[in-house]
């Protein structure tokens, strides 16, 4: 039975690595996958899912106006799809999460989404909010704070390594711009305790 999955975490937990491994596992068994990533995230090149450990795969892009159900349904007319995998799923809209649930419910294709749960202000992203609400299965991928505790928050940093507390929710960046931390160190660095 097909399901909608959401694998979530803070940054540097291996979400893209896990997605790429899942896609490889399907393809190794002669099953086809459709891999998507957000057009907004071009850190490693447009149309690529790339892991920090150096592996990558070409991907279709989703933008705010992309109708994922229609696009996947069109692709099915050309070839069978055994699994859909979505990287940077926090950037999905509410409507796109609903479309992915239709891929599961109407097309009977499993959809595996990977993304951040919250932003640098500890607020849910739109895509994450609706995946947390509507996914059939949720799984947290864990990483650690510099103190060794589980990291479940992310700090945004400026060029001098100082914490930024305000700004646009979406700012594409990697290890130079963000730091995954535990709740205690998030509160400390944000001046909340």
From Swiss-Prot:
Subunit structure: Homotetramer.
Entry's Gene Ontology cellular component terms: cytosol
Positions of the catalytic residues: 88 (proton acceptor)
Alphabetic keyword roster: ATP-binding, Cytoplasm, DNA synthesis, Kinase, Metal-binding, Nucleotide-binding, Transferase, Zinc
Enzyme class, broadest EC rank: transferase
GO BP terms: DNA biosynthetic process; thymidine metabolic process
EC number: 2.7.1.21
One Pfam family, short name: TK
Source taxonomy: Bacteria, Pseudomonadati, Pseudomonadota, Gammaproteobacteria, Pasteurellales
Gene this protein is translated from: tdk
Coiled coil location: none
Protein name, entry field: Thymidine kinase
Similarity field: Belongs to the thymidine kinase family.
Binding site for ATP: 9-16, 87-90
Annotated Zn(2+) binding sites: 145, 147, 182, 185
Cited PROSITE patterns: TK_CELLULAR_TYPE
